[in-house]
């Protein structure tokens, strides 16, 4: 019967390790992720696109000038000239200091995440372990009775393992989205130079802030699941070993599905909350 226990324990260990990895990822900066090698590449791409962004800045500025000013006399008006000059300066600053802006947004969200974890009194997630009642019941099961237990265990282990990888892939996906936003930022930020195109730059900044805020939603979901994990599903010791195991795995997988579903929908939740 050790094989049944080992299968479930292995699946739960995979889940616990991925959940612990999520906590580390959510508190890690993109600059130090994977030793900082990815960040160095992103910086090179960002610097290369800055030149293109500055060229687009002029294009968007001229296009906005044509769209908003009906004649040369409009441009010569002091208030209009100052407005155009200020818009150009702000747009250029966004391109030149866009990296600092995005890093600042990320640090603010990291502060929010730290406040949530400190307030909840959590720094690491509670581990999900197999109850002793289940271990004792399976150990006392005969050979013939163990056949359905193998089926239940294999299905449960496969399902838990799949959920573990879906969960961690979603969190890694958030990291890669932040890298993509940072690398390509000079292009959409250049749109701030034109009055008719400025919404593109503002939408980009709000969208990046939304990606960062996904981390706060994921942390809250992990905290809620940790509360579930600290009070595991109730095990009916009077039931048969098959019923006991099936009931436990079913309730455990349901709790895991809630967590994985919330993590997968974190982007949608942020958009609904913040109107992004």
Q: Which sequence ranges carry the predicted segments?
A:
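Transmembrane helix-loop boundary segments of multi-pass membrane transporters
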Residues: 170-178, 202-213
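Hydrophobic transmembrane alpha-helix segments characteristic of membrane transport
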Residues: 56-92, 184-198
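Non-cytosolic segments of integral membrane proteins
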Residues: 92-184, 218, 222-275
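Binding/recognition "hotspot" determinant
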Residues: 1-56
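Alpha-helical transmembrane segments
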Residues: 189-206, 269-273
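Alpha-helical transmembrane spans of integral membrane proteins, capturing the lipid-embedded, hydrophobic core
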Residues: 56, 60, 64, 84, ...
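Alpha-helical transmembrane segments and their helix-start/interface "positive-inside/aromatic belt" motifs
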Residues: 1-7, 78-98, 201-211
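Alpha-helical membrane-interface segments at transmembrane helix boundaries
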Residues: 42-50, 82-86, 90, 139, ...
């Amino acid at each position: 019967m050790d094989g049944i226990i080992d299968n479930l324990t292995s699946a739960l260990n995979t889940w616990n390790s991925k959940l612990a990895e999520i906590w580390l990822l959510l508190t890690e900066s993109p600059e130090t992720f994977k030793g900082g090698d990815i960040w160095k590449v992103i910086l090179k791409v960002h610097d290369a696109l800055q030149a293109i962004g500055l060229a687009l800045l002029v294009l968007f500025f001229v296009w906005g000038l044509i769209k908003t000013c009906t004649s040369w006399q409009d441009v010569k008006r002091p208030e209009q000239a100052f407005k155009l000059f200020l818009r150009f300066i702000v747009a250029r600053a966004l391109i030149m200091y866009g990296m600092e802006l995005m890093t600042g947004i990320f640090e603010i969200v990291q502060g929010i995440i730290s406040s949530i974890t400190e307030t909840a009194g959590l720094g690491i997630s509670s581990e999900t372990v197999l109850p002793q009642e289940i271990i004792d019941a399976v150990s006392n099961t005969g050979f013939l009775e163990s056949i359905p237990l193998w089926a239940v265990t294999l299905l449960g282990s496969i399902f838990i393992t799949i959920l573990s990888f879906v969960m961690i892939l979603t969190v890694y996906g958030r990291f890669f989205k932040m890298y993509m936003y940072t690398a390509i930022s000079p292009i959409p930020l250049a749109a701030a130079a034109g009055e008719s195109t400025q919404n593109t730059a503002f939408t980009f900044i709000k969208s990046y802030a939304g990606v960062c805020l996904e981390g706060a939603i994921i942390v809250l979901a992990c905290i809620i699941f940790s509360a579930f994990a600290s009070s595991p599903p109730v095990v009916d010791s009077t039931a048969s070993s098959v019923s006991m195991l099936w009931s436990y795995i079913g309730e455990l997988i349901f709790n895991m599905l809630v967590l994985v579903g919330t993590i997968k929908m974190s982007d949608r939740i942020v958009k609904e909350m913040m109107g992004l």
